[in-house]
């Protein structure tokens, strides 16, 4: 009961403070109308922030009050001696105990699932911000993503930067970039930005800016992404000139040998793939691509563009919509996701533990990437992924960062010195370095 009383007192106190704050806000608005100088404008802005903060606190206290009342009702509800809940349809008690009550009031089944995001609305919203705040938010959600998500899970956060502002009646106010940090039970609206959607849209719109600033997700760093993109134009040019095992051209008698070789190159296969993609466009994504083309974004229009692999530098969870119709781009992202799974499998294999513990350390980046990308309206060409793996797989695995950078001989020597010293000063078993 004391909890309810305390919460009610807090609600009453905050309601009184809110009445006073709203009156002060009205006074400040009148003062700005009479004399719109900097002092009055700053006062108005401070009053608006105070009212907003009090409204948020009051709403929070009211939610807590509702939760407390609900808990109290559950605690005082009489229990059935048979152990069966009054509204349970079973005539005899189940062998399972009653678990949590899942509240589905907040779920709107009319909203599309998270896989069918409104990419046009999301793209227009993001393009409306300045490049500095977009790239800083990307850094916080990729390079420092794990920490940011952990600290803000279950909330809707706002990114603020001095370069992002808007003028309202001559008053300069911050223009916040909103990103929702969902939990597993959250239902996202089609136009709502989440960390995954934000990384996807920004990576697709601004790969050149990401490349210049070398913004990279840790999961891409450990698979050797920096090494892979170092000489990308030469790397992809050599790949395109290689013979493709999946092409069997119809050769007419008397065709020159040189022309026969050209018709079997990977470049020809990619041209055929481009023809397939050109027939499978989705109207909303086309609208986004046209809108982006009229502004600052630097989306690649070909896989041999210098910035093409940087589309995946921050590990988007699907192929960005702005380059999904570029032959080989969606498959390049799938190749990177397989490399992430391969590295995690290697790490799980070398750890000590039961088979079950090792399996838990494996990942399924590829399956997730495949499912999300194909939900955008295209089927990935597994043959292109296979070509990438045959060409670069061995090289990339050799450049994985496996958390063991010490030379084996050096490690053995250091361990021997540790063992010797521990034996001199203690009878305990020396730990491994």
From Swiss-Prot:
- Specify where the region named Viral panhandle binding lies, as residue ranges: 1-175
Region listing for Interaction with host DAXX, in residue ranges: 377-433
Renumbered residue ranges of the record's region Homomultimerization: 1-79, 100-125, 377-425
For bias type Basic and acidic residues, the affected ranges are 67-78
Q: Which residue stretches belong to region Viral RNA-binding?
A: 175-217
Map motif YxxL onto the chain: 178-181
Q: Which domain of life is it from?
A: Viruses
* Pfam families per record: Hanta_nucleocap
Q: Which pairs of positions does the record mark as disulfide bonds? A: none
Q: Name one GO cellular component term.
A: host cell Golgi apparatus
Where does this protein chiefly localize? virion
Give the residue ranges for region: Chaperone activity: 1-100
Q: What does this protein do?
A: Encapsidates the genome protecting it from nucleases. The encapsidated genomic RNA is termed the nucleocapsid (NC) and serves as template for transcription and replication. The nucleocapsid has a left-handed helical structure. As a trimer, specifically binds and acts as a chaperone to unwind the panhandle structure formed by the viral RNA (vRNA) termini. Involved in the transcription and replication initiation of vRNA by mediating primer annealing. Plays a role in cap snatching by sequestering capped RNAs in P bodies for use by the viral RdRp during transcription initiation.
Q: What is this protein called?
A: Nucleoprotein
Organism from which the protein derives: Puumala virus (strain Evo/12CG/93)
Gene that specifies this protein: N
């Amino acid at each position: 009961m004391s909890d309810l009383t305390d919460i009610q007192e807090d609600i009453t106190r905050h309601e009184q403070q809110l009445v006073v704050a709203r009156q002060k806000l009205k006074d400040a608005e009148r003062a700005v109308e009479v004399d719109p100088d900097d002092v009055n404008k700053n006062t108005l802005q401070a009053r608006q922030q105070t009212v907003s903060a009090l409204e948020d606190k009051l709403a929070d206290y009211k939610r807590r009050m509702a939760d407390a009342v609900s808990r109290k009702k559950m605690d005082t509800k009489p229990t059935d001696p048979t152990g069966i809940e009054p509204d349970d349809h079973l005539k005899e008690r189940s062998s399972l105990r009653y678990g949590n009550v899942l509240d589905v009031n907040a779920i709107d089944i009319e909203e599309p699932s998270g896989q069918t995001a409104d990419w046009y609305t999301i793209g227009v919203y993001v393009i409306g911000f300045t490049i500095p705040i977009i790239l800083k938010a990307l850094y916080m959600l990729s390079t420092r993503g794990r920490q940011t998500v952990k600290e803000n899970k279950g909330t809707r956060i706002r990114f603020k930067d001095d370069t992002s502002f808007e003028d309202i009646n001559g008053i300069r106010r911050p223009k916040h970039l909103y990103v929702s940090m969902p939990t597993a039970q959250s239902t996202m609206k089609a136009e709502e930005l989440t960390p995954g959607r934000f990384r996807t849209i920004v990576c697709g719109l601004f790969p050149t800016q990401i490349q210049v600033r070398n913004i990279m997700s840790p999961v891409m760093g450990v698979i050797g992404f920096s090494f892979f993109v170092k000489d990308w134009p030469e790397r992809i040019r050599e790949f395109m000139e290689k013979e493709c095992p999946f092409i069997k051209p119809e050769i007419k008698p008397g065709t020159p040998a040189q022309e026969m070789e050209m018709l079997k190159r990977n470049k020809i296969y990619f041209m055929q793939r481009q023809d397939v993609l050109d027939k499978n466009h989705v109207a909303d994504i086309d609208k986004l691509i046209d809108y982006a083309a009229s502004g600052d974004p630097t989306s690649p229009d070909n896989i041999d563009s210098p910035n093409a692999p940087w589309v995946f530098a921050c590990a988007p969870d699907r192929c960005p919509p702005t380059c999904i119709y570029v032959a080989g781009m969606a498959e390049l992202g799938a190749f990177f996701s397989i490399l992430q799974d391969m590295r995690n499998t290697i790490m799980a294999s070398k750890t000590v533990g039961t088979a079950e513990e090792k399996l838990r350390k494996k990942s399924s980046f590829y399956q997730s990437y495949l499912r999300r990308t194909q939900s955008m309206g295209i089927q990935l060409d597994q043959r292109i992924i296979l070509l990438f793996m045959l060409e670069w797989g061995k090289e990339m695995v050799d450049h994985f960062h496996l958390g063991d950078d010490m030379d084996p001989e050096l490690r053995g020597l250091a361990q021997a010195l540790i063992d010797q010293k521990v034996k001199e000063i203690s009878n305990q078993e020396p730990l491994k370095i």
